[in-house]
Amino acid sequence: MKKLKCHCGEVVAEINLEKKIDELMRCNCSMCKRKGTIYKIIKKEDLKIIKGETKIKTYQFNTKVAKHYFCSECGSHTHNLRRSDPNTYGINMGCIDEIDANELFKFKINIRDGQNHPLDKK
């Protein structure tokens, strides 16, 4: 288990990252391109909020399927419920203190085409 934390430490989650860190992604939707977050997809049951549930705020837009979660104190985006698979979260790898952010760029980072998502309203 690893800890996923916002910048101020008010929101903390335990996450199960399975065996190794790979299959990282970035999304190019209008929200994610502004955040620039590197994500790892995990099953919903592999994330448990252990501190600050009342500090977590949600942002939704367009189809209002995906949910982008952030800390109401520091604004850190911690994770999101994915619209392409609502049984999974995209976790912000930058919120895991044990992982050096520079190490993330050594992995292949897949780009997901959120700009042309089939569920988007046309």
Each language-model region and where it sits:
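A short Gly-Trp-Pro
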Residues: 1-5, 10-122
